[in-house]
Structures are given as structure tokens and as C-alpha cells.
Amino acid sequence: MDSELMHSIVGSYHKPPERVFVPSFTQNEPSQNCHPANLEVTSPKILHSPNSQALILALKTLQEKIHRLELERTQAEDNLNILSREAAQYKKALENETNERNLAHQELIKQKKDISIQLSSAQSRCTLLEKQLEYTKRMVLNVEREKNMILEQQAQLQREKEQDQMKLYAKLEKLDVLEKECFRLTTTQKTAEDKIKHLEEKLKEEEHQRKLFQDKASELQTGLEISKIIMSSVSNLKHSKEKKKSSKKTKCIKRRPPWQICSKFGALPFVAEKMRQHRDPHILQKPFNVTETRCLPKPSRTTSWCKAIPPDSEKSISICDNLSELLMAMQDELDQMSMEHQELLKQMKETESHSVCDDIECELECLLKKMEIKGEQISKLKKHQDSVCKLQQKVQNSKMSEASGIQQEDSYPKGSKNIKNSPRKCLTDTNLFQKNSSFHPIRVHNLQMKLRRDDIMWEQ
């Protein structure tokens, strides 16, 4: 389009036409443009001119060119408008792009700031987490230590429980042993009680026998009194005959040895040593050293009343023998118990275990109790024997008094004093006869009283 304008006659706004032939009437163009009505008026005049056709053509071309130029101008204006619009659009697009870039940059800056803030917060969190990790590690270590301490305490408690259980088992075993010992002691106590009952029954039987013996002794005394009466009646008849023989009999009595005097008064009583009963089994002795002295039979010169021992006295001697045998047996049992006591003491010294020592101590206590019971039984039996011996002595004394009364009546007719001869007196007489053949009756009486005072004393 620009090229067309450049080569056109009129030219363009940018560049004028290179070759434009300006006719002579170009000077009158403005007036024509200005006064178109005049052309129409004057047209018939111009038409008659020779250049009229050329002018008309030129005018037509000019009109066309003007029309074209106007079109071009409109087109150019349109283009300018379009360009301005496009420029505005471009500006708007640029502004939008710049705005978008700015927004994107701002967003990036914000994102960077946010990321930096997040990083700082993450770092702070990391430090906190590290601190928390250290704290948790410490807590875990403390918990492990506490756990170990608790486990150790539990193990110690378990050990203590086991020790307590062992102690309980030991105590239970001791209780079982004590129960067994208690059962054994109860059985021994029952056996001892049975033995005591048996011995009490025996003692009752012996007391019954003693009562029977006393009854027999009373019967014998009545018999002796009757015999005295009979003998007194017989002695009155034979008094005259025996007066002559009295002097000879007194001489024979003085010349006789002491064993014959003892035979005159029957058997001597039992003599016991003076001793103390100790509870200690080591010092225990045999309580009786029985020395029974039997006198020999009387020679033929003595009277007929003293020739033989009566059967009642033989029975009493047999009872005394039985009692002495029983005493000896009980003393043997006591000796055996003392031997057992010594053996247990040796075992106690040899052993080291406390349980065995406790058992031996219990056995020793039981033995001591048995020995005490046995000692009491022996003392009771001795008392019974003493009572039996006293009864026997009374019977013998009664018989001897009768015999001595008859002899004194025969030997001392002038009324000398009748001294009752007891078995103890018989013993003193024998001792005095051994020392000196001549003795006084007052001295004999003093010795008799002394012996009665120094009789057997059993300390309990």
C-alpha cells in the first residue's frame, strides 16, 4: 500500500510524489474545491475547452485518489486504533506479567521466609528433641537402676523367705522331736505310774501283813501272859528245888562267853549304818549294810524255856529276810540307774550336737526322777522293815523278859532288881563282857538309853 502511494501522483503523507506534473490549472484547484457549484455552472464553458477532457480525467483520478487516500487514512486510523489497542493489551499483558512475576517473587520470598522460619523451628525442635532424648536416656538409666535395685531387693526378700522357711522347717522338726519326746515321756510316766501303783499295792499288802503280824504279836503276848501265869504256878512248886541250884547257875553265867549270852536272848536285831540319802546318783550308797548276827544254840545247862526259838519268831525272821532281800533288789536297781546316769553323762560329754545333748538331758531328768521315786520307795520299805523289826524286838523282849525274870528269880532270891533285857542290851552286854567281865546294871541302863538316842536317823 505504501508503494502504491509512493508511485501515485498525489503521493502519500510520509513521502511526496517524485514526479508530479502540475498543469496550469492546478493553481485554480482550491477555488474549484471551494466552489463546486461554480464548476457545475461553468462546466459547459470548460467542456467547450480543448483540455476539458483531460481535466475531467484528471479530476476523476484525483477524486479516486482522494477517495483512496481517505480509505487509506481510515485504514490507517483503524490500524492505529488496532495498534493502540494491541499496545494497550501488550502493556496490560506486560503489567500482568510483571505483576505475576512480582507476585511470584514475593511468594518465593514468603516461601523462603516460611522455610527459614520452619528450619529455625525445626532446629529448635531438634534441640528440644535432643534434650528430651538425653532426659529420656537419663530416665531410662534411672529406671534400669531402680529395676536392678528392685530385683536385688526381691532376691534378698526371696532369700530371707527361704531362710525363714528353713527356720520354720527346723522349728517344725524340733517340734516333732519334742512331741516324740513328750510322747515318750508320757509313756515313761505312765509306766512309772503303773509301777508306783504296783508298789503301792505291794506296800498295802505289806501293811496288811504287818497288821496281821501285829495281830499275831498281840496273840503271842496274850499267850505269853497265859504262859507267865502257868509258869508262875509251876515256879511256886519248883521254887524249893531251884534254890539250891541258883548259886551254881550264877557262876555259870559269869563264866560263859558273850556268844552264849546272846544265844540266851535269841537273834540280834538288824544294825544299819548312819548315812544321808543324796539325790546325786554318784554319791548314792547302799543304804543298809545289814549285819544279822545269829547266836549259836544254848548249851544243855540253861533252862528249858530258852532251849529253842519259837515258830512265831522264825516267821518274823523269814519276813525280815524277805524285806532285806527286797531292799537289796531295789538297791541293785538304784545302782543300775546310777550306772546308766554315769553312762549318759559320758555320752553327753562326748557328743557335740545340741539336739542329742537335749535328749540326754531329758533322759537324765527322767532318770533322776526315777531314782528319787526309788529312794522314796526304799525309805518307805526301810521304815516298814524298822517297824517289823521293832515288833519282832518287842516280841523277843517280852520273851526274854520272861526268861530273865525266871532266871533272876532263880539266881537272886533275896529280892534283887529285875532289869529287862532288850536285844540292844544284849549287844551292849556282849561288848562289855569282851572288855570287862564285871559290869554294873546302871552302866548297862545308861548304854541302853544312849543307843536309843543314837538310833537310826533317816534324813529326807
Curated annotation (Swiss-Prot):
Keyword terms, alphabetized: Coiled coil, Cytoplasm, Cytoskeleton, Microtubule, Phosphoprotein
Pfam family, one: Cep57_CLD
GO cellular component: centrosome; cytoplasm; microtubule
Places the protein is found: Cytoplasm, Cytoskeleton, Microtubule organizing center, Centrosome
InterPro entries, per the entry: Centrosomal_MT-associated, Cep57_CLD, Cep57_MT-bd_dom
Organism superkingdom: Eukaryota
Coiled coil: 51-228, 317-384
Stretch list, region Disordered: 399-423
Entry similarity comment: Belongs to the translokin family.
Record function comment: Centrosomal protein which may be required for microtubule attachment to centrosomes.
PANTHER family: CENTROSOMAL PROTEIN CEP57L1 (PTHR19336:SF10), UNCHARACTERIZED DUF1167 (PTHR19336)
Name the record gives this protein: Centrosomal protein CEP57L1
Organism of this sequence: Homo sapiens
Gene expressing this chain: CEP57L1
